[in-house]
């Protein structure tokens, strides 16, 4: 296979983990979302896909794609000037940072991603 080419294993779900991740980011208790903001939901989506490995191959790539897709779907992907909030280099960096992080640092990783999205909003 050529470099950068996906294998036949790419994107194959191992179990129902991906469905569980999607459910977890919109989970609520007592009528309130556990992750109330779009930024928190997007950050957790990236974190859970990268760390929980719901696919046999491609978890980082799928996690990065789903993160950007989720931001786009919820109209949180652009700065006020029309540029993307998260450029390609930042996306690679935060995805690899999450992948290399210790599970005990989950809150730090999620907070970093949330702050990065908010900081790029110009608020």
What are these regions (language model features)?
Residues 1-123:
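FIC/Doc superfamily catalytic core
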